[in-house]
Amino acid sequence: MCIRDRFGGVGDKKEKVKYFNYSEFDSPDVQGSGQMMNKLVLDMLDEVREKFDKPIHINSGYRTPQHNEAVGGTENSSHLKGLAVDITCDNSIDRFDLINCLLDVGFSRIGVAKTFIHADIDPDKVQGVMWTY
């Protein structure tokens, strides 16, 4: 199934996310903006958390255009659409396990940095890619 077929809408404020609070995905400049995260991304992250079997810290979720610019994000950042997350990860063992979990649940775009992993499902971008920062 292609990612475009699985692509869902923005999360409903009444829907429950099992392992996360919507506030964990807030852009730091707008309280409550984590509600802009795509529901499929949240469901996939719950699956990742289940498989990873350890707490996951979201470093960046939804971003407002202002915050995205402030952190040096690209103009077409998937964070602006609620389709991306950056997960804190600073050791090789967890990094390996977390990447495997992300791939297992269907994240098809992964960026690897020294202290975080970026994962997104943006259907407007090339799929099946992994890069380093």
Each model region followed by its residue ranges:
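Short, small-residue-biased leader/transition segments that mark boundaries at the very start
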Residues: 1-3
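Periplasmic peptidoglycan-binding/tethering modules of Gram-negative envelope proteins
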Residues: 6
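Acidic/histidine-rich, surface-exposed loop or edge segments in extracytoplasmic proteins
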Residues: 11-32, 79
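Second-shell loop/turn segments in exported
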Residues: 29-37, 88
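Stable alpha-helical elements in mature extracytoplasmic
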Residues: 37-44, 94, 98
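Extended, low-complexity, intrinsically disordered C-terminal regulatory tails
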Residues: 42-72
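Catalytic cores and adjacent binding grooves of peptidoglycan-active enzymes
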Residues: 76, 80-81, 85-133
